[in-house]
Amino acid sequence: MASTRLEHMFEVTIEAGLEPGAGTRTVLDRAREARRAELAAAAELLVVAAEWADLHPVPRNGQPAGWGEVDLHGEGLVPLAGEGTPQVAEFAPVELAAHLGISHDAGRQLIGDALELRHRLPRLFDLALAGTVPAWRARQAAALTTRLTPGA
């Protein structure tokens, strides 16, 4: 089988194609290791998003980041995360999203989920960082709790 080189998005070169003598065990071990790395990277991304938010608090008289637009009809911004979480400067999610190559909405959601987990669901945040709960599942829970009151 011919080898295909994938090196556009990654700092490392990934060789596609079986090495001579590679069996099912080798392929399964590589798959398991790739999945472990993927889960660890997703958890690390939550930490990075929360740290990015810490570095970009809302300046005095500044506009916080949120969902929606302020317009003539009085619609306001919905915060990125639930009550009690820190507000983030307006353009912080946009800058992070650009660096990650994701949409602005995905950047807002990532930061919102990270803040929701760290401030309102700290045990779940710790479980995600430990790898006990996949980050994607923790983020689903965070998205469901954002509008709940702290006592709920």
Residue ranges and their predicted role:
Residues M1-A152:
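Peripheral, non-cofactor segments flanking catalytic/redox cores
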